[in-house]
């Protein structure tokens, strides 16, 4: 996301992401000043530094760094139905539930941030929407149905798009064959 600002881009990596506008024509939506991050397992030094950098560059946000020990304070997902879910699948469900219930910005815990995230609020206002995401051009075969990236999401609370995404993912995980 910020590679063009701080360092050269590796030409061998074809991983370009573009802005997508979800739910246009909303004129007064506000993204809450909350950043959500989640990590399951031992906290690597790199991840800890990423989280500290997010806090440092975004002092005007409440940064909620969640783990399996404190995630229940903010969302109530029934993991009893998901005994075989991977940590990545759990994180996906958590991100969609948090964004739907509370709004704010979801940022993967291992994301390196170089600047304040207020630019998201400006983009949302500029495009008259209540949410923000990137889509991956390389994986999108039909522009009407883009493949969204989920490492950086933003929305006002109660956006049905994120509730629907949660519900579809939950069904897919429940249908996954048990090994």
Where do the protein language model's features map onto the residues?
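Extracytoplasmic/secreted proteins, especially bacterial periplasmic and envelope-associated proteins
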Residues: 46-49, 94, 160, 164
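Serine-centered coil/turn micro-motif
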Residues: 111, 159-160
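Conserved beta strand-loop-helix elements of the APE1-like EEP
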Residues: 149-158
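Conserved interaction-surface patches within small, structured recognition/assembly domains
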Residues: 75-90
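Catalytic core and acceptor-binding pocket of nucleotide-sugar-dependent glycosyltransferases
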Residues: 161-179
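GT-A fold catalytic core of metal-dependent nucleotide-sugar glycosyltransferases
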Residues: 89-148
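N-terminal anchoring/stem segment of glycosyltransferases
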Residues: 1-78, 157
